């Protein structure tokens, strides 16, 4: 039914089957060289949300990322028709690039869809003791409650070394990640090319183990340089995941590179 509604092409069907997920949406081009890809991915995301989100009050959890940050402004105001959308960040701020933080993206998405948003201003990476203390704070607990009741999650898929550097890994930790052959990072977990978790950070926000409870999940990643990272993460992705990507990444994955 969903394939018919979205006129799924052979490539999209083949990619979803290869990755073991519900659906893929592929836009033309390669984001490594063509900025227009982000506009089309934003429009695809908007159409998918319009199809899948329930009417009335809907909560959408957002995890930051460069691709999603560049596509957020292309959400359609039509999403607000018969909906009261609430956008919440899925994790604390990285503190490096404000534009790609989930706190910034939720504000832009809410503005585009006449929705509301909440923020989570705290370090993304914390100690175990600090985590136990923080989640008891009323303002933080309120956001975490919304996350647990989300109708949809939209997340990126990061390159392991890049994400580790943003999280302040020192040279020793970066070297250890290379030795463990970490390829990708998602939800604070670092995965090798086979999808095995080789490292993990304690973060406040959406926990990977709880992702399976969310009705609709959108993985948002593009460009040929992300192909290996996408492929490495997908063995862990819940089946209800939709991947929104471009030809640059999809062609590399299907060719087995």
Which residue ranges define each predicted feature?
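Ligand-binding beta-strand-loop-alpha-helix segment within the catalytic cores
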Residues: 11-56, 80-161, 168-170, 174
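N-terminal helix-turn-helix DNA-binding module of bacterial transcription factors
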Residues: 1-10
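ATP/nucleoside-binding phosphotransfer catalytic cores, i.e., glycine-rich phosphate-binding loops
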Residues: 9, 193-257
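Gly/Ser/Thr-rich loops at beta-strand to alpha-helix junctions
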Residues: 60-71, 95, 159-161, 223-226
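Conserved acidic residues
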Residues: 58, 151-152, 215, 241
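Short, solvent-exposed amphipathic alpha-helical segments in soluble enzyme
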Residues: 76-78, 169-175, 232-239
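Gly/Ser/Thr-rich active-site loops/lids in small-molecule metabolic enzymes
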Residues: 166-196
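Solvent-exposed alpha-helices and their adjacent loops that cap or buttress functional pockets
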Residues: 51-55, 79-81, 110, 144-148, ...
């Amino acid at each position: 039914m969903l394939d018919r509604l979205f006129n799924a092409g052979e490539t999209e069907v083949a990619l979803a089957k290869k990755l073991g997920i519900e659906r893929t949406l592929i836009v033309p081009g390669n984001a490594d060289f063509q900025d227009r890809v982000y506009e089309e991915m934003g429009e695809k995301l908007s159409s998918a949300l319009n199809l899948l989100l329930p009417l009335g009050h809907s909560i959408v959890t957002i995890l930051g990322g460069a691709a999603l940050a560049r596509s957020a402004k292309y959400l359609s105001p039509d999403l607000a028709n018969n909906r009261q959308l609430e956008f919440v960040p899925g994790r604390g701020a990285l503190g490096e690039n404000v534009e790609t933080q989930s706190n910034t993206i939720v504000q832009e998405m809410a503005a585009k869809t006449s929705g509301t948003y909440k923020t989570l201003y705290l370090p993304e990476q914390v100690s175990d003791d600090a985590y136990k203390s923080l989640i008891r704070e009323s303002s933080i607990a309120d956001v975490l409650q919304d996350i647990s009741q989300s109708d949809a999650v939209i997340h990126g898929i990061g390159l392991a070394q890049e994400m580790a550097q943003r999280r302040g890994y020192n040279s020793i930790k970066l070297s250890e990640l290379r030795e463990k052959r970490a390829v990708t990072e998602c939800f604070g977990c670092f995965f090798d090319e086979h999808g095995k978790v080789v490292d993990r950070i304690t973060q406040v926000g959406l926990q990977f183990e709880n992702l399976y409870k969310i009705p609709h999940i959108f993985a948002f990643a593009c460009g040929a340089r992300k192909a290996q990272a996408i492929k490495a993460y997908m063995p862990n992705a819940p089946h209800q995941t939709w991947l929104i990507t471009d030809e640059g990444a999809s062609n590399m994955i299907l060719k087995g590179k």
